[in-house]
C-alpha cells in the first residue's frame, strides 16, 4: 500500500484540533494510562547557543515525537524563539498520521495542565476555573492560560493526536 502524506496542521489548525477542556480531560486520562511511555528528552546544544529538543512518547494508540529548536536570539531577527513540530505515528505500521505545530501544542498543553490542576484542586460546578485572574504565568504563557481558563468543551478525545488526525482542518 502506498504511503499517504500525513495531515500537516499549521498553528491555527493545531489550536482548533486541541480544544482546552478536551485536552485537559485527555491529560487526566493519560496520567492514569499504564501504556504511556515518556522517556527523558534529549537536549542537543547547537552552534550559536541554541538547543535542539527531541521528546518521544507513546501509548497504545500513538507514537509521537516533539522536535523543536530554541534559539533565544531569534526574536531580535524577527523569528520565533521556539520552532518545530510534533509528528504522530501509527504504532502498528509506523506511518505518519499528522504533523502538529510544536509551539502551539506546547502552549495549549501547558495551559490545559494548569486548567486540569485548577479544576482538580478547586472544582467548580459551573466548569470554569475559579480565581483565574490570580493565576501566575509568564508574560508569554499568560494569554494561553487565560484562554484555557475561559474555554469550555465536552468529552475526552481518544487522544489529542488522534483527534487532530481526524480533524477536517
Model feature map: region roles:
Residues 111-114, 118-167:
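Glycine-rich adenosine-cofactor-binding loop
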Amino acid at each position: 500500500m502506498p504511503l499517504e502524506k500525513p495531515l500537516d496542521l499549521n498553528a491555527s489548525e493545531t489550536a482548533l484540533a486541541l480544544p482546552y477542556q478536551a485536552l485537559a480531560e485527555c491529560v487526566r486520562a493519560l496520567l492514569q494510562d499504564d501504556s504511556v511511555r515518556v522517556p527523558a528528552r534529549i537536549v542537543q546544544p547547537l552552534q550559536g547557543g541554541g538547543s535542539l529538543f527531541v521528546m518521544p512518547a507513546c501509548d497504545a494508540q500513538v507514537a509521537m515525537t516533539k522536535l523543536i529548536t530554541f534559539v533565544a536570539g531569534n526574536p531580535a531577527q524577527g523569528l520565533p524563539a521556539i520552532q518545530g513540530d510534533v509528528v504522530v505515528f501509527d504504532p502498528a505500521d509506523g506511518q505518519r498520521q499528522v504533523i502538529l505545530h510544536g509551539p502551539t501544542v506546547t502552549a495549549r498543553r501547558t495551559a490545559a495542565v494548569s486548567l486540569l490542576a485548577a479544576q482538580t484542586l478547586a472544582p467548580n460546578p459551573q466548569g470554569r476555573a475559579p480565581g483565574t485572574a490570580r493565576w501566575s504565568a509568564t508574560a508569554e504563557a499568560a494569554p494561553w492560560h487565560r484562554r484555557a481558563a475561559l474555554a469550555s468543551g465536552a468529552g475526552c478525545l481518544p487522544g489529542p493526536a488522534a483527534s487532530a488526525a481526524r480533524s477536517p482542518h
